[in-house]
């Protein structure tokens, strides 16, 4: 195996995670993580043309599976330099009194607890090595609450607080912590949120020139390739057509 640094990416099989995998493939050996075994296999085959690839199949919500899979990494793979906490989702867009508890559980379990589970077991490695860089994918929804965003916004506000807490607690261990907060990004995000309602999903991006996964992947690459003494702690990325969570210039 080459001397490239190792980057672990959660939610690697679609959207921002998939774009980031391809963006980083020329520079890093990659551990790609996701729930879909077939998609992981297909992505691994493509990425292996450019770099060394290891796949870990797990659901970030399952803390025992997360622990087991990360603990199973061989000596060649266990010294993770970069963690991209990308796995996340939104479910529903409802007034809080009309929301579904199952949707709330999915968002909190994935966006908050899942991020914590993966971070916990990777940090055991990074602290031992006295180095590392964690990049948490937040959201503009973690900076501004918008109508019907309630629980999704809460989950991303939690990511914001966790990122800040990590940066403080891990400073003495020589570990950088960055957070990237995208605005509207045209991925499968809205299809998941609206339960595969394509018409409703498409309406989110109608009349806009939104960000795409590759845009955020380039920002991630920039953040992790800054000089060793530079830590970009927090960055919000919007399309030109988006001024805030609710102010959009539709054509």
Residues covered by each model-derived region:
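Conserved glycine-rich cofactor-binding loop
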Residues: 13-14
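Conserved glycine-rich Rossmann-like NAD(P)H-binding loop of the short-chain dehydrogenase/reductase
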Residues: 28-43
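The beta1-alpha1 cofactor-binding region of Rossmann-like NAD(H)/NADP(H)-dependent oxidoreductases
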Residues: 57-68, 101
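Substrate-binding pocket helix/loop in short-chain dehydrogenase/reductase
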Residues: 94-96, 100-105
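Active-site helix of classical SDR
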Residues: 119, 155
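Residue(s) in the substrate-gating loop at a strand-loop-helix junction
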Residues: 139
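C-terminal helical subdomain
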Residues: 179-180, 198-246
């Amino acid at each position: 195996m080459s001397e490239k640094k190792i980057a672990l990416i959660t939610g690697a099989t679609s959207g921002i995670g998939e774009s980031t995998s391809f963006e980083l493939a020329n520079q890093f050996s990659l551990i790609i993580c996701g729930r879909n075994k077939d998609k992981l296999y297909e992505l691994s085959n493509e990425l292996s043309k450019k770099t060394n690839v290891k796949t870990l199949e797990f659901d970030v919500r399952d803390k025992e599976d997360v622990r087991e899979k990360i603990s199973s990494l061989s000596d060649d793979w266990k010294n993770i330099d970069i963690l991209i906490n990308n796995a996340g989702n939104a479910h529903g867009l409802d007034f809080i009194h009309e929301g579904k508890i199952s949707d709330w559980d999915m968002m909190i379990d994935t966006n908050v607890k899942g991020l914590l589970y993966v971070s916990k077991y990777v940090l055991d490695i990074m602290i031992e090595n006295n180095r590392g860089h964690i990049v948490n994918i937040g959201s503009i929804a973690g900076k501004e609450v918008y109508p019907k965003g309630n629980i999704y916004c809460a989950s991303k506000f939690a990511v914001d607080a966790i990122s800040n807490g990590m940066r403080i607690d891990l400073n003495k261990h020589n570990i950088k912590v960055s957070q990237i907060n995208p605005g509207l990004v045209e991925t499968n995000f809205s299809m998941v949120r609206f339960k595969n309602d394509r018409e409703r999903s498409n309406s989110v991006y109608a009349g806009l020139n939104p960000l795409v996964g590759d845009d955020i992947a380039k920002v991630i690459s920039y953040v992790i390739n800054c000089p060793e003494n530079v830590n970009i702690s927090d960055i919000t990325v919007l399309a030109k057509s988006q001024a805030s969570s609710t102010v959009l210039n539709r054509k």
